[in-house]
Design a protein with these regions (language model features):
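Iron-sulfur (Fe-S) cluster-binding modules
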Residues: 1-53, 65-69, 73-77
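Small-residue-enriched alpha-helical segments and adjacent helix-cap loops
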Residues: 25-28, 50-179
Length: 179
């Protein structure tokens, strides 16, 4: 799924790169930068000297290859602050210009999506971490989570949605994902 969307959203990257270069050159105010960068899952951090990027992993699904790519990115860009979020995304903080520009391209080359991870776009879909192995689950919802994410990604840049639209699935009678 992500590979298809990363190829689709690559066409938007020049807009992000231009805004990011202007932000670091102080030609774009933080609020103006946020208006562009937020849709790419990237935000200027307090003080306007660094940025944060949010990587989408639908339902918190991190495959072995994803973990290897994250490890390599951490080494390559000397990343010091990695945050695994409650929305089952991964964030890298305190990024300088060369780090964010290179990292963004590497993510898209590896099929890791950032588009729509912020701003007025559907956020990462969350789901219970134990789906597929939880003895109390009604059925494994993983494929439904992936299909729903694919559907919501199709709205990016096409339909105006409510701010921070969040979708979560659950697979048992409990409220494990806090839906």
């Amino acid at each position: 799924m992500n590979k298809r969307w990363t190829e689709h959203f690559k066409a938007d990257l020049p807009t992000f790169y231009d805004a990011t270069r202007k932000f670091y050159a102080k030609e774009l105010k933080p609020a103006e930068y946020k208006g562009v960068s937020g849709g790419f899952g990237c935000y200027g951090e307090r003080g306007g000297e660094t940025t944060m990027i949010r990587l989408r992993f639908t339902g918190g699904i991190l495959e072995r290859e994803d973990l290897i790519q994250l490890r390599e990115a951490i080494k390559k860009y000397n990343l010091k602050f990695v945050h695994f979020t409650t929305c089952q995304s991964v964030q890298f903080h305190h990024l300088k210009e060369n780090q964010i520009l290179g990292l963004m391209m590497d993510c898209y080359e590896q099929g890791i999506l950032t588009r729509g991870a912020g701003s007025d776009f559907p956020r990462n879909i969350t789901a219970p971490a134990l789906r597929g192995v939880d003895p109390l689950e009604y059925f494994d919802i993983t494929e439904l989570v992936k299909e729903a994410a694919d559907y919501l990604l199709s709205f990016i840049g096409v339909v105006e949605l409510p701010r921070k639209l969040k979708v979560s699935f659950k697979n048992t009678g409990t409220n494990a994902p806090h839906t």
